[in-house]
Each structure stands twice: as C-alpha cells, then as structure tokens.
Amino acid sequence: MNLKNNLILIDSTISYNDIKNFEKDSDFITFDYESHVMLKKNNIEHKISDSFIKKHEFDIIQEKLYKFSNWYDDEKISKELKYKYVNLGSLFYIELWMFLIPIVKKFFEIIKISSNLDTKNIFASQIVCQMGRCLQFEFQNISDAQHDMNYFYDNFKFDSNFFSLKLSSKNFNKLKNLSEKFFHPFTESSKKTPNNAVLLIEFNTVKTEVLLQEFRKNNIDVISYCRRRPAIWNSKSLQVIRKTKCIVPSYSDLINDKILENVSKESQSKLRSIMILFENDNIFSKIFEINGVTFWEFLKPYLFELFKKRLEQSILEIELTYQILKKTRPKCVLIQSESGNTEQIALSISKKLKIPVILLQHGFLKSSEGGFKLNKFTKSIMNHSDQFMVWGNFMLDNAQKFNMDMKKIFALGAYTHDELFNLAPESEQKNKNLLLLTEGPIWDDVREYNIHELDEYKNSLIHIFQTAKSLKRKLIVKLHPYENDHNEQEIAKKIDSSIVVVKKRNLLSLIQSSDVVILLGTSISTAVLDAIILNKPVIRLPFGEWYGDYGDGSCINIEKNEFKEKLKQIINNKEFRQQIIEDQKRFLNDYLINQGCATQKIVSHIHKIVNSGI
C-alpha cells in the first residue's frame, strides 16, 4: 500500500470533526457502513475494509465464528462451566456469536491491512486501538467516543407500526412476573399437576392454538412453559389457554426462598471459579485465534462481562426448569429449536431424567452445504433431541444427504399451516396490490456486514419501488419482524409517497390482498409457503446469495434487468402466471406433506410416545 503520512482507520464512533484536520495528508479506511456514508457525504476519498478480504475468506471467517462461539465445548474447560448437567457457556452462545461477527471481521481486516503498512502515523478509534495491540501495534486514539458494546439480550425491543419501546432485560422480567400474577386467577388449570402430560417449551400460545386444541381432543394434558415471553399477554392468548385447559406454571408456582438463596450462593461460587478459569490465557489464546494471531487479550474482558451478566439468571432458569420437570414428570418435552437457553436447559435436564425430547421443525430451513452448517450451528435441526419432526420429504432428503440419523426423523407436516390449507384459495386475480417481503441484513452472517451487500439491498429496494410506480401498482412493503430498519420508509417516501411500509401487520391479510408476492432477503421466509398455498406467484430478486439456497423451486429468481418485464408478464399473461403457480405447488407438495391434517398426524405420533414411550 502506498500510503500518505497518516492512515486513519475509521468506524462509527469517529465523527467528521475528529478527522477534518487530517484530510489533506491522510489515507482513510472505513470499517462499517456508517463511516463509509459519512466520508462519502463529505466527498472524502477512502477505501473500504471489506476490500481487503477475498471472497473465500468470508467463508473462513464464518467458520471461525462458529468455532469461537462454541468455545465452551473445549474439553479443557467444559467441566468447569457445568451446573446441574448444563454447560453455562452454551446458554449465551448465540448472543456471543452476534457480538463476535463484526469484531472478528474487523480484527481479520486489521491483520490484512497491517501486513502492508509502511506509514508512521496510524490513527484509529478506541476499539481498533485495542485490537491493534493484539498485533503489537500502538495506534493513536483519534476519538474519545466509547463504542457501544451492548449484548443482544441486554434489552428487549417492542415494535409497532407507530412506536418502538425498549426495556432492559431486568425490567422486562419484572413486567413478565407481574403479568403472570395478574392472569394467574383466570387460569384455574394452572393449579393442577397432571400425571400424564407433554411439556411445551417457549411456544407462542396464539400460533399454537390448533396444536393445543388437538391435544385437548386426544385427552393429552399440556403444560406451556414460557420464560422468554409470557404464555398469556392479551385476551386472545388467555382465551386459548382457558379453552384448551392448558396448564401455565407461573414464576410464583416454582420459586421459593430456598431456591433464591441457593441461586445467590451458587452464582457467587461459580463466578469465583470462572474468574480463575479465565486466567488460563494459554488455553483461551489458542481457542480465540485466527490467521495465527490470537485476540484473547481484547476479548477477555468482554466475554467475562457477558458471562457475569448472564450467570445468576442462568442458574435461576436451571433451578426453575429442574423444578418444573421434576414436579410434573412429563411424558415428553416439545421444543422448536435447541439453541434457546430455556430449550437447552430443558434438553440437558430431560436427558438426565430420561424424559424424551422432540424437536419440531420451525421455519424454512436452508438446504445447501453452507446452509446446513448454519442450521447445525443455530441448532434449528436435531443435535441432541431424541426425535425430529420435519415438514416434508424435502427435509427428509436433506437430512439423508447430510448423514443425519434417519431413524429419529419423521416427516409429519406443519401444524402452523393447516388452517391455510383449509381456506379456499383464490383462483382469479382480484387484487392489484404488490406485496414486498423484505429481510435486509439481520447481522447473523459476516457477509451481512459487507458494505457492498448493504448498498445492493438498498439499490434493489429502489429498483422495486420504481418498478411498482411505473406499473401504477400499489406496493405494500412488509419488513421482517426481527430486522433492523435500513431506512426503507425514507427510501419509499422519496420515490412514491403511496408506498406503505409496515413491520407489524397481519401477514395473511396482506398476502390475500396482493396479486404478486416479491421477496428480497438473505433467506426464504415461511411467508413464501403461505403465498404458494394461497395461489400467489412468488418472485425474488437476487440478494444474499452466499448459501446458494435459492434454486429449490420455492420462487422464481429474476435478475434486476429482467424484473420489470417478468413482473408485467406475470400480471398480464394468465397462462404464464398459472405455470409459475403450478411449478411452485410442486415444490410445496414436496416441502409440506399432510396438508391440512398435519396437526392430527403430529399429535397422533406424540400420543404413542405418551402411552408407550420412545
């Protein structure tokens, strides 16, 4: 690199005022989208840190992130992390992963940049200076601004179409416990302890209504154990619980002074042992190493802080879950992923108590080799469960392709879609709306921090908005509920004020009122299945292609330069439109079996386990 006298390494903590006096005799490298936009706005020539990473190196970083996030499995330290059969480090591995993605990317980029440094003066943000020390560089701090190092579950955010509310996890738990006390008198069944029941872990009451009703019809008692979110939060969820006689144990049902005292005592003891464990720098330096360089010195205080923040609550959750399992002795436990902390705890303790655990497929899973690795890491597929109930033959074929234990996997369908199959699908085009389902970068892959990808997402949005306007079609944009906003509302306003952008809206009604469904995102949404069931053609603009999961037939992939003509053809040519729908129905029949009766099949299978075990 032929650098000037100064090199400025910029991230979002550095303002224009921090660097304006360095413009003439400095080279600039930006490390995130905000800093890139800031320099672009001020017409400052700069390089982007992404440009120092080769395409295949993004795969290397992603693989390393899986390994770093599973640090707790290292045989030299895993025993020290156990509490009542549960590895405490595993309970926040997803949170650590989300924290590490931008950190490891930045560290890898600094390694690449530093290999060609030939300048004397290097200025950087506080966090980049800290990373530089791991490489024996003393960068000069150019800004006093602190980097926001909050962790994913430090706060809970509640979004509506009109406002957003953020609560600390502590305040959220207080409100949750209060709401349980409020609803407790209305759920008489919660006072019972059944002898023959299934335990549902973290199931959404309203979305699970058909499943709860079917259990009731088959005289199977259900205990709904929800710790991350309340089982009852409004009149509809209360109605479902009362109607299905579902048992909802509250915090007050399970807690007592002895448990609280023990949690406090064990937390303090475990914290002391973790402090000692974290002094084993030789072990951790080898775990957190990339390209032959360790970043343990940088990570150590952050990992310890995260562990400390989550420790007492984790031990409390273990004690509560142990109480519910021991008290009710369910015939089986149902979960929808193995990654959530409640699910992990229930899975570990159930194994010891010899209670079978069944994993139900939840959502549209990736099918490529890279996608399978992500599924495995996020524990969306079976790792430790006794059985895995999938939606159809498509997932069975994938399970076989990746050498999963086929004796434990059963294709029974999706209870979540039964009601849709029993609706009469529209056969004629009655609406002129276009529905755009977006999933911009949600920061769960290192490539989603690539500035080019963010620019590409926004350029694709603009193209879709302009196309809808030119075709004189009303466009409704439905944002993914867990997505951070990427200025979709502002972009829409600049192009066409009639474009409606929503985050919280009934998805079924949006699909029903649309003529064509357009997908723009890094993964296939289950809403695509909903649209196909309702006879809506689904098209997709390429974005986030790194896993290669988009040739499965679920939707038509259309390049940007063909988008307008293909969309016009779908709208105006009935034969072409019908052919797309028929092709997508073939995919649907492979992906979802037992259409309209999956709930009965699932409950029938569980009924056998309740009566005779696995």
Model-based region annotation:
Residues 1-614:
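Catalytic-core helical/loop segments in enzymes performing group transfer/polymerization on anionic/lipid-linked
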